[in-house]
Amino acid sequence: EQLNLPIDQLRLFGKSTIGSVIKFAGRKLEVKKIDDANFKDLDYVIFSAGSEVASKFCKKAVSDGAFVIDMSSHFRYDENVPLIIPEINGDELSNIDKPSIIANPNCSTAQLLMVLKPIHDMCKITSVDVATYQAVSGTGKAATQELYNQIYIKEGYEDQNIYPKQIAFNVI
């Protein structure tokens, strides 16, 4: 809304929010079921619903003719999907055929690169050592449930094995 972009259509899709109404630019928009999504006639589709949704629907959106921006981790290691941080390599967007998919890097990576790029432009950084600590919630609802179970439920539950080792009280 703040950018006042020329938006003819805005479709909202979800799973747990189906039927919810969102106000945008003076319009009331209802969240529709993503399983029934039709991406035809959409120029851009932004996915910010996790890797499972991205794996199911991003390629469908591209085949329907849309340019897809995926915010999940699903395509981050796919060499055919460019990672784009507009302030860093946004100029590469002009070289990407549409319809297509672009992805964004991990949030820690994006923030770090925003700081390092101007320094690199001045004096060519050759190496950086970084340690980050990511939230369990970034892995999804099943991971947060596993963490909860490991902390509060002492017996009678079965681990989902989202992580290779116990996540509660641990750094992995």
Predicted segments with their positions:
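N-terminal Rossmann-like NAD(P) cofactor-binding subdomain of oxidoreductases
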Residues: 1-167
